[in-house]
C-alpha cells in the first residue's frame, strides 16, 4: 500500500530520470520532483506532466531566469523548438534561480534568488514574442515584474 510519498532512486529503482517521469504518470501523482533535468526526454516528460495538471519541479543549472528558458528550449532539436516553447510557456508558472554566496565578513553564506512568476499576462506576452526575441523579452519582463539577482544582492 502506497503512502503519501513515493520515491524512486536513479539507477537503483529506475534507469533514468525520463523513466522516473514516465513511471510517475502511472501513479496519478499530485507532484513530481526530478533532481535535475538536462536532456530533452526528461524535460519533455516534465512539461507533459505539467500539462496534465501535475506540479512538476526540477533543477536546471543556469545563471538566470532567461538563461533557464534558453537552456530548456535549446536542448530540443531545432525542428521541435517552436512547439516546445509554446507548450513550456503555456504550463510554466515560476522560474527561480538561486546562488549561495559568501556573506560580507566571510561568516556563512546567503541565498540570493532571481525569480519571475509566469502570470497569464506574462505568458501571453512571451507567447506573442518572435522566437528570436524571447530571451531578450524575458529579461525585460524580469526587470519589470520579477526580482533580478542584483536586486537580491543589494537587499541581502
Which residues does each predicted region cover?
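Short, flexible helix-loop junctions that flank or precede catalytic/ligand sites
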Residues: 1-156
Amino acid at each position: 500500500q502506497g503512502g503519501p510519498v513515493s520515491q524512486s532512486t536513479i539507477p537503483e529503482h529506475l534507469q533514468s530520470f525520463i523513466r522516473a517521469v514516465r513511471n510517475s504518470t502511472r501513479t496519478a501523482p499530485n507532484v513530481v520532483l526530478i533532481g535535475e533535468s538536462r536532456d530533452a526526454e526528461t524535460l519533455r516528460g516534465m512539461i507533459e506532466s505539467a500539462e496534465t495538471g501535475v506540479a512538476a519541479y526540477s533543477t536546471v543549472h543556469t545563471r538566470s531566469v532567461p538563461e533557464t528558458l534558453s537552456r530548456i528550449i535549446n536542448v530540443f532539436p531545432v525542428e521541435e523548438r517552436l512547439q516546445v516553447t509554446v507548450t513550456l510557456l503555456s504550463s510554466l508558472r515560476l522560474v527561480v534561480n538561486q546562488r549561495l554566496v559568501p556573506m560580507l565578513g566571510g561568516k556563512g553564506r546567503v541565498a540570493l534568488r532571481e525569480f519571475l512568476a509566469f502570470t497569464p499576462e506574462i505568458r501571453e506576452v512571451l507567447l506573442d514574442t518572435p522566437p528570436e526575441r524571447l530571451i531578450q523579452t524575458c529579461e525585460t519582463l524580469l526587470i519589470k515584474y520579477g526580482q533580478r539577482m542584483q536586486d537580491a544582492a543589494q537587499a541581502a
